[in-house]
Amino acid sequence: MAGRGKGKTSGKKAVSRSAKAGLQFPVGRIARYLKKGKYAERIGAGAPVYLAAVLEYLTAEVLELAGNAARDNKKNRIVPRHIQLAIRNDEELGKLLGEVTIASGGVLPNIHAVLLPKKTKGGKGEETA
């Protein structure tokens, strides 16, 4: 009857749900928050994995665009201004986060077309009268 019981059978190392799903975001922590938040009486096993994947994708998308904005401004560090520019210049992210205020984000540079100086017709040397 050797080998029976509840003792450790092998030295397998525990693998997190994040690692199983190939994610960087913590699936276990998100599951805990979903349970603690009382969003529903019960939470399915796949729900925190899916939510972690969605959050990771959105974060990667925003960071990619913010990194591009920082590089365009010849900076090595992403600051809130770069995140603001990234979100507001992207159509889909702008729609998703339209009502969100980003602290120290500033505003998009925009001059209404009516306020711009009028363009004159022709080029140089028109006034030869």
UniProtKB/Swiss-Prot annotation:
Gene3D superfamilies xrefs: Histone, subunit A
Localization in the cell: Nucleus; Chromosome
SUPFAM superfamilies xrefs: Histone-fold
Sorted UniProt keywords: Chromosome, DNA-binding, Nucleosome core, Nucleus
Gene Ontology terms: cellular component: nucleosome; nucleus
SMART domains: H2A
Annotated Pfam families: Histone (PF00125), Histone_H2A_C (PF16211)
Gene Ontology molecular function: any one: DNA binding
Keyword Nuclease: no
Summary of subunit composition and partner proteins: The nucleosome is a histone octamer containing two molecules each of H2A, H2B, H3 and H4 assembled in one H3-H4 heterotetramer and two H2A-H2B heterodimers. The octamer wraps approximately 147 bp of DNA.
Family under the similarity heading: Belongs to the histone H2A family.
Function text: Core component of nucleosome. Nucleosomes wrap and compact DNA into chromatin, limiting DNA accessibility to the cellular machineries which require DNA as a template. Histones thereby play a central role in transcription regulation, DNA repair, DNA replication and chromosomal stability. DNA accessibility is regulated via a complex set of post-translational modifications of histones, also called histone code, and nucleosome remodeling.
Name recorded for this polypeptide: Histone H2A
Annotated organism of origin: Chlamydomonas reinhardtii (Chlamydomonas smithii)
Lineage: Eukaryota, Viridiplantae, Chlorophyta, core chlorophytes, Chlorophyceae
Gene name of this polypeptide: H2A-II
